[in-house]
Amino acid sequence: MTLLALKEDRPTPKAVYNWRVYTCAAIASFASCMIGYDSSFIGTTLALPSFTKEFDFASYTPGALALLQSNIVSVYQAGAFFGSLFAFATSYFLGRRRSLIAFSVVFIIGAAIMLAADGQRRGVDPIIAGRVLAGIGVGGASNMVPIYISELAPPAVRGRLVGIYELGWQIGGLVGFWINYGVNTTMAPTRSQWLIPFAVQLIPAGLLFLGSFWIPESPRWLFANGRREEAIKVLCWIRNLEPTDRYIVEEISYIDADLQRYAREVGKGFWKPFLSLKQPKVRWRFFLGGMLFLWQNGSGINAINYYSPTVFRSIGITGTNTGFLTTGIFGVVKMVLTIIWLLWLVDLVGRRRILFVGATGGSLCMWFIGAYIKIAGPGTTKTEEAKLTSGGIAAIFFFYLWTAFYTPSWNGTPWVINSEMFDQNTRSLGQASAAANNWFWNFIISRFTPQMFIKMEYGVYFFFASLMLLSVVFIYFFIPETKSIPLEAMDRLFAIKSVHNANKILMDELNFDRNPEREQSSLDEKDRVTQTENAV
């Protein structure tokens, strides 16, 4: 099997895997670049000497400073929580593409407001207000982009294409982690030093805004809203095939059948998906989607993203530049491993297996780091020149090993699964629920991490390690493998009782249904058996 080999649900023309579908996914993923950047730059910006001096952090007690920092960080997640819910309404009435335009505008306004902050008159209030609006923008985009990409993607590369969204997140995060190292080493600690990281937010948001005028609307949304001719035209353009091609005819028939079935079972309309929550199978999938983000945030990733200087200081890394450098390396490792996940792991190894490995290995690393901090107490050292012990070096190694386990597993896979497992009539609501869950748990972590490090110290790492172990049990019993399964067959996948064998069972069913020669051979065999029995 080659690196980029694909497992197809049916014979697929090579033209389907064309530049158009990848370009649309890449443009939509500018949204994740702005999410990744905003998630990573804020922690190190709050540690910049110019920022701490401008807003007089030295005058705060440790508890008061932790509260201020957590408020600056967490209002973004609070806004994102509500933005992800607003996206359900905009998705229904405006569609996927125009929703992306709207949320990029909201983000741009929020980012511009942040630039008005200063230490003399306005204080940090513009930053807090702007981060609420920016949060609404990224919350809506985090809902919309995985849906949009999954509805454009051929099944064999759906994980890879939704993974571009995760790659964009890591690229934005990489820039966010390194930008403060750059301004801290090359610029004097003036107001301009900390304004630059805030201003850079406007770049990915502007690219998303402009790019959204070029990408087409989701053909599935167009079909669902009665714009059939436009939907077929868009589908043919994305697939690079003629309307009469067998692949296009089959895909249209699958979409039609799915829409007709749900029109009967659920009905059409803005409120109808809410009525579908009466069905246990729908509620169950909403629960699964939300729990995936609980376990993702329970790994500790966002404690590191938002408060990396605090995290590295607890291990024993002191000095502003040293902390920024270590954080930047963390961003590089994450991006490289995301590319590996995107090109190989997610669609070849599958979703379940990498979640198992990531949670198990990551948990072991967290146990080691916590034990080291408990025994050595490196975070108690106050001097900037403190040297790392061999145990401290080992702890840093295990931190990066944790990154190697977490990134190609839990970082993007929950988004992929949530983009796949809901049917057409509940997909927007389901993704809104999943994104809201992500931002809710994100808010909890970002709001309380500074206080957790003050109160729990090494226990923070034991806490995250325990949650990662619990996620292994959850995945084994409740999450089926979704790779290569058409969106229209997800109901059948989640109806199969044998969770660990569900993917194989369904793929065998799909291959049998689409192989008339095999079916005819089976019928001929039955006829021969019947004739033999009659002869006897």
Curated annotation (Swiss-Prot):
GO biological process, one term: quinate metabolic process
Family stated for the protein in its record: Belongs to the major facilitator superfamily. Sugar transporter (TC 2.A.1.1) family.
Keyword check for Transport: yes
Molecular-function GO terms, alphabetical: carbohydrate:proton symporter activity
Protein name: Quinate permease
UniProt-annotated stretches for the region Disordered: 516-536
Lipid bilayer topology: Multi-pass membrane protein
Organism: Neurospora africana
Top-level taxonomy: Eukaryota, Fungi, Dikarya, Ascomycota, Pezizomycotina
